[in-house]
Amino acid sequence: MDFHIRNSNLQEIEVRRKPHSRSPKIQQTEAEATAMNFRIPATASSIPTKYQTVFIPTSEKNGFNSRSLRFSYSLTQNENPGPGAYNVARTSADINSVSLSKKGTGGFPSKAPRTLQCKIARTPAPNAYNVYEEFFSKKDFSKGNSSMFQQPIAMEVEDTNHLTPAPNQYSASLTYCHPNNNVSAHAAFVSKTKRELLKPNPVKGPSPCHYKINDSLVKESTKVPVSCFKSKTSRNSLNVISDNPGPASYDPYKSSESEKKIIFLRKHYLCFSAPAMPIPKAPPVPGPGHYDIVDYEGLPKQYMSGAAFVSNTSRWAGDVSGKSLPGPGAYHPEIPGRYSFLYNSNRKWVPA
């Protein structure tokens, strides 16, 4: 049977009662208690009992031959007032009021109360709470180990920035690697349209090196004030790549190379063992002096009507300037003479 008591030094002492007998087992227990620094009363109690009281102190073990506590307070003490310190009795304020005379009241006493009627809140009493020990901020630092016998508080945290999974740790989903058509029914007229989401054949598209990325949408714009009428002319002329030949590619004074004629050998001309004929080279590209540039504005406009009932009469008079028309000296006017005709037997008019 174990219970706790409190002595005059406000130290909690655990008390155990054992059967009071002098058997060899009890004597062995007393010897063990003496070895464990238990306090056993020297004199037996005057009242005959069946139990023997043994005091087990809860003091700290000797550390570096020092028994004194580092802090004098005890954890069993509570700084808050106890439940009996509160006056929660419902007493009337008029009985202990200072404004009332001890000899009584007059003939016409006022019935108005001199004090405000404070309503007592229906709250639980202080002893109705059951506070757990984990909420107390007190800690007995007297029984704690020194810093040299315990691990440091600040532990080294493992660096997890470079702990990335390996490529073989991923589980690739195989749901999209095969057709998703799980229909087991088979109709009489089966449609040949594929139901797969992904195409089985790879897309024959250009490789990434065939793209020309426009950097105008990626580059950040300057954070300087810009005019509302901003010029759209590109100032970056270095990125303009032209496929035309450079200025030094032409030689205007060089004679044009004549095409070399293929000379067929007479010996192997009509044989299957004739040598392969060389492929003729491409003719040279014409230079700047080979062109005859003419200001060509295109065909003249033909103004056509777009109404529903279009007239067939031509509205285009042709060359209005008259450059292609013959001049006055281009005509040879002749006076037409008189002709006579005879009607022959074949019923045709023949000039006479």
From Swiss-Prot:
Keywords: Apoptosis, Cytoplasm, Nucleus, Repeat
Transmembrane stretches, start-end: none
Organism: Xenopus laevis
One GO BP: apoptotic process
Keyword Acetylation attributed: no
Cellular compartment(s): Cytoplasm; Nucleus
Keyword Aminoacyl-tRNA synthetase: no
Family classification: Belongs to the STPG1 family.
STPGR-type repeats, residues: 80-90, 124-139, 165-171, 205-235, 244-263, 286-295, 325-335
InterPro entries reported for this sequence: SHIPPO-rpt
Protein origin, superkingdom: Eukaryota
Name of encoding gene: stpg1
Protein name as annotated: O(6)-methylguanine-induced apoptosis 2
Function of the molecule: May positively contribute to the induction of apoptosis triggered by O(6)-methylguanine.
Primary location class: cytoplasm
Entry GO terms, CC: cytoplasm; female pronucleus; germinal vesicle; male pronucleus
A Pfam family reported for this protein in Swiss-Prot or TrEMBL: SHIPPO-rpt
Molecular function GO terms recorded: chromatin binding; histone binding
